[in-house]
From Swiss-Prot:
Principal EC category: transferase
Predominant subcellular localization, coarse grouping: cytoplasm
The protein's name in its UniProt record: tRNA-cytidine(32) 2-sulfurtransferase
Organism: Aliivibrio fischeri (strain ATCC 700601 / ES114)
Binding site for [4Fe-4S] cluster: C119, C122, C210
Residues in coiled coil: none
Keyword ATP-binding: yes
Reactions it catalyzes: cytidine(32) in tRNA + S-sulfanyl-L-cysteinyl-[cysteine desulfurase] + AH2 + ATP = 2-thiocytidine(32) in tRNA + L-cysteinyl-[cysteine desulfurase] + A + AMP + diphosphate + H(+)
Cofactor comment: Binds 1 [4Fe-4S] cluster per subunit. The cluster is chelated by three Cys residues, the fourth Fe has a free coordination site that may bind a sulfur atom transferred from the persulfide of IscS.
Note: The thiolation reaction likely consists of two steps: a first activation step by ATP to form an adenylated intermediate of the target base of tRNA, and a second nucleophilic substitution step of the sulfur (S) atom supplied by the hydrosulfide attached to the Fe-S cluster.
Gene that this sequence comes from: ttcA
Residue ranges annotated as motif PP-loop motif: 44-49
Role description: Catalyzes the ATP-dependent 2-thiolation of cytidine in position 32 of tRNA, to form 2-thiocytidine (s(2)C32). The sulfur atoms are provided by the cysteine/cysteine desulfurase (IscS) system.
Gene Ontology molecular function, alphabetical: 4 iron, 4 sulfur cluster binding; ATP binding; magnesium ion binding; sulfurtransferase activity; tRNA binding
Cofactor: Mg(2+); [4Fe-4S] cluster
């Protein structure tokens, strides 16, 4: 990271503290990291995974428990991929790491017709390789760099295109049932990560597969959410809070809630029917940090009390 001015250092410290706090809260709320864990931190070379590794290394220094980190990057043999960047960066950090070389690029190019999205196949191939690598390394947890915006986008994708009220959980058991997958940045906003990565000046490596494909469903949902966030500040926070405050009895999934057993002797369930009530919308919980302008300590005034 290049040398910062006094004002820039203040704003960097403030942002780092915010991301660190949000990450720590997510880890605590979902019990993501336990004593003795060996965590495989998946490092793609993008802003999210760089930030995740950075914050986890910081938390490791002050955590009341002991855990190990090993950074893993999957070199998918994309043309022009700068294979030297991550090893050099990780060597400087002094963190344990492993570069896994697998030519998934050729497989994707061979199987997917030109113009079609490659994300689904690429994701499945990458997932299988990472699960295998985690087993080889003796990792107990696999850490992915998805943030709050990713989680919300996934929920809307499933609603709009899959007909499911399903998101991206902060913690789950891997597809093969052998590992626990965690998302430590689940409480972090993408806009904060973008600012932080820019201040950190990470050696970002763009993805030539998914990053060059316009008009994808996820991009449309991202644009929709960004528009809402600009027009109605606080909506993103409110929607994420809703994902943590689910009332199955007031939805329509009879597999989740036993509607058939309800009768006139059941009594009021979760507040009863609100269909006839006047809607009372609570004040949007705008993030306090977002409402505060950046501060330059050099402009601070000395206030003198006058009797």
């Amino acid at each position: 990271m290049s040398e910062l001015t006094k004002a820039q250092q203040y704003n960097f410290n403030k942002l780092q503290k915010k991301i660190r706090r949000n990450t720590g809260n997510a880890i605590a709320d979902y019990n993501m990291i336990e004593d003795g864990d060996r965590i495989m931190v998946c490092l793609s070379g993008g802003k999210d995974s760089f930030t995740m590794l950075d914050i986890l290394m910081s938390l490791k220094k002050s955590a009341p428990i002991s855990f190990d980190l090993i950074a893993v990057n999957l070199d998918q043999k994309q043309p022009g991929f700068p294979a030297h960047i991550l090893p050099e960066y990780l060597e400087k950090l002094g963190v344990e790491y492993k570069i896994v070389e697998e030519d998934t690029y050729s497989i994707v190019q061979d199987k997917i017709p030109e113009g079609k999205t490659t994300c689904s196949l690429c994701s499945r191939l990458r997932r299988g390789i990472l699960y295998r690598t985690a087993k080889e390394l003796g990792a107990t947890k696999i850490a992915l760099g998805h943030h709050r915006d990713d989680i919300l986008e996934t929920m809307f994708l499933n609603m709009f295109y899959g007909g499911k009220l399903k998101g991206m959980p902060p913690k789950l058991v891997s597809d093969n049932g052998e590992h626990v997958v965690i998302r430590p940045l689940a409480y972090c906003r993408e806009k904060d990560i973008i600012k932080y990565a820019d201040m950190r000046d990470y050696p970002i490596i763009p993805c030539n597969l998914c990053g060059s494909q316009p008009n994808m469903q996820r991009q449309n949902v991202k644009q929709m959410l960004n528009t809402w966030d600009k027009q109605f500040p606080g909506r993103i926070e409110t929607m994420f809070t809703a994902m943590q405050n689910v009332v199955p009895s007031h939805l329509a999934d009879f597999n989740t809630f036993d509607f058939k057993s309800i009768n006139r002797d059941s009594g009021v369930i979760n507040g009863g029917d609100i269909g006839f009530d006047k809607e009372e919308m609570p004040t949007l919980p705008v993030d306090a940090d977002d409402a505060v302008a950046e501060f330059d300590p050099s402009l601070k005034l000395d206030v003198v009390n006058v009797d």
